[in-house]
Regions:
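Conserved Radical SAM active-site core
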Residues: 2-156, 160-165, 195, 200-202
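Structural recognition of alpha->loop->beta junctions
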Residues: 100-109, 113-114, 176-183, 307-310
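A structural motif corresponding to the C-terminal lobe/cap of the Radical SAM core domain
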Residues: 132-140, 147, 164-244
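Long, highly charged, low-complexity intrinsically disordered interaction regions
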Residues: 198-270, 304-325
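Short alpha-helical segments in extracytoplasmic peptidoglycan/chitin-binding modules
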Residues: 268, 281-282
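Residue-level signature of tetratricopeptide-repeat
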Residues: 285-286
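Short, basic-rich loop-to-helix N-cap that marks the start of a DNA-contacting helix
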Residues: 289-294
Length: 325
């Protein structure tokens, strides 16, 4: 995947970004024909298979988006490229540009960066949360619902720790985005202060915090958890010591142990160490014969050492089986 900027050296002043206005980087840009030709050369040499295209804002949002669309259009129309193109939608782009992006791209995205307008104002004062970020995301969501854009959908990104937000705020924004904006994925980026930016003196955000957000996100998207079930502490933070699924299980002893041979697939995926695929395999496996030992858990793809304290195998605690392995 070629990840590239159409232009560097931005007109906006997001406090965390190395490309911010007045930053130390050298401003440069590529014309659509230049970038399209360079990508095709890499494609022909089999060094890349797809394009992830973003840009710093140069000459205004509309002109910047036009250059990006120009690159994508050359690849599709002139060079006949049918592979993966991910287009970042520049905040401030016109609705017709968003429509054009959906006709050209496999996936589109606009970065929320923060969970609310108040948080965004602290870190990206030049961006308008509702008009420039949420509005185009709603436009894409409407197209998805109408069946006009059904490829890889849209994604977004949240910066972690830049605006004093809580983990609950971030996960609340993600849950809302999955529900209302038809998001395919939310990505989380732990703030790592860049020299020469207003946040240069801050401590970097631990990557474990980012990791816990991703784990909680998976619980929302793939494990049937609601936002209210994510185990935040009293301050709205996720534990850095224990993963959220295990912590939820520890906080709900009334739900465990689960009998693997009788539990629904929905209950199995809530067991620490059992994911959607391994839960499905266990359901299929037990149709042929009872699941009686940890070897069967391992065969199904479950992390049996993690799952064992939370399950019964044919009526017996799985912990007793551990001595055999």
């Amino acid at each position: 995947m070629l990840k590239v900027l159409q232009a560097s050296g931005c007109e906006r002043s997001c406090i965390y970004c190395v490309e911010r206005c007045g930053g130390q980087g050298r401003a440069t840009s590529l014309e659509p024909a230049q970038l399209a030709s360079a990508f095709v050369a890499l494609l022909r040499s089999r060094r890349v298979t797809g394009l992830f295209l973003s840009s710093a804002i140069r000459g205004g949002a509309v002109a910047t988006m036009d250059r990006m669309l120009g690159t994508a259009e050359l690849l599709r129309r002139l060079h006949g490229f049918r592979g993966y193109i991910h287009l970042k939608m520049i905040p401030g782009s016109r609705p017709d540009q968003i429509e054009q992006a959906m006709t050209l791209a496999t996936r589109v995205s606009v970065n929320m960066e923060a969970p609310s307008a108040a948080h965004l104002a602290q870190i990206a004062p030049g961006k308008k949360f509702d008009a420039q970020i949420i509005a185009p995301m709603r436009q894409v969501a409407a197209a998805i619902r109408q069946g006009r854009f059904a490829r890889a959908g849209q994604t977004t990104q949240l910066v972690v720790g830049a605006s004093g937000e809580r983990d609950r705020d971030l996960m609340g924004a993600a849950a809302w985005g999955y529900r209302e904006l038809k998001l395919a994925r939310v990505y989380y980026s732990a703030l790592q202060p860049v020299p020469g930016t207003p946040v240069a003196g801050r401590a970097p955000i631990p990557f474990m915090r980012e990791h816990r957000l991703y784990q909680s996100d998976f619980l929302l998207r793939s494990y049937g958890f609601s936002l209210d079930e994510i185990p935040f502490d009293a301050t709205g933070s996720l534990s850095l010591d224990t993963d959220p699924k295990t912590l939820w299980a520890q906080q709900h002893p009334e739900r465990f142990p689960v009998e693997v041979n009788q539990a629904s697939q929905a209950d199995l995926v809530r067991v620490p160490g059992i994911g959607p695929r391994s839960a499905q395999r266990l359901v299929v496996m037990r149709r042929e014969h009872p699941v009686r030992d940890v070897a069967a858990l391992r065969e199904a793809g479950a992390s049996w050492k993690i799952a064992s304290p939370f399950v019964l195998l044919d009526g017996k605690p799985a912990l007793r089986q551990l001595r055999l392995f």
